[in-house]
Amino acid sequence: MSRIGKSPIVIPAGVTVEVKDGIITVKGKKGQLVQEFSDVNVTVEGDQVLVERSSDHKDHRAKHGLFRSLISNMVVGVSEGFTKELELVGVGYRASNQGQKLDLALGYSHNIVLEIAPEVSLETISEKGKNPIVKLTSFDKQLLGQVAAKIRGFRKPEPYKGKGVKFVGEVLRRKAGKSA
């Protein structure tokens, strides 16, 4: 049995969970999330959500822990929310935002303008002498990770000088340059 899958999910106060016809809906103060599920049985008992697999088939065992984690992330998201911070490391790298539009100067001949989904709140922090930081906040962990990965993908950190867009706290594997 999956160690992750068999542990129950505790529903905090202010969060409602509804299960109907293979669709789970989680509502909270931050928003509402809907997820389709298959091959597992989801039941709500009091202030707990239990995820059980329908059989011991290989596919069902694989999805047991997955759906438990997805539902757990939904519950945490609508109650507390998630945050990701990206740091722009490099000379002349800048970030600014106008509403939900993120404007990035990453050393290309043109600026990159990215329209951010309305579910993700955007904030840019630029302090003199420090690297600019893009702070993303959302109740949907999947969407947040997707947006953050897209921004990071515009200029991935390179291993020699460490220049590029990286997550705050991310440890980069550095390489030594050519020895003269």
Swiss-Prot record:
KW Chaperone (keyword) present: no
Organism of origin: Flavobacterium johnsoniae (strain ATCC 17061 / DSM 2064 / JCM 8514 / BCRC 14874 / CCUG 350202 / NBRC 14942 / NCIMB 11054 / UW101)
Gene Ontology biological-process annotations: cytoplasmic translation
Oligomeric and partner information: Part of the 50S ribosomal subunit.
Recorded GO CC terms: cytosolic large ribosomal subunit
Name of the protein described by the UniProt record: Large ribosomal subunit protein uL6
One Pfam match: Ribosomal_L6
PANTHER family: 60S/50S RIBOSOMAL PROTEIN L6/L9 (PTHR11655), LARGE RIBOSOMAL SUBUNIT PROTEIN UL6M (PTHR11655:SF14)
Keyword set, alphabetical order: Ribonucleoprotein, Ribosomal protein, RNA-binding, rRNA-binding
Gene responsible for this protein: rplF
GO molecular function: rRNA binding; structural constituent of ribosome
Origin superkingdom: Bacteria
InterPro entries reported for this sequence: Ribosomal_uL6-like (IPR000702), Ribosomal_uL6-like_a/b-dom_sf (IPR036789), Ribosomal_uL6_a/b-dom (IPR020040), Ribosomal_uL6_bac-type (IPR019906), Ribosomal_uL6_CS (IPR002358)
Similarity comment: family membership: Belongs to the universal ribosomal protein uL6 family.
Main function: This protein binds to the 23S rRNA, and is important in its secondary structure. It is located near the subunit interface in the base of the L7/L12 stalk, and near the tRNA binding site of the peptidyltransferase center.
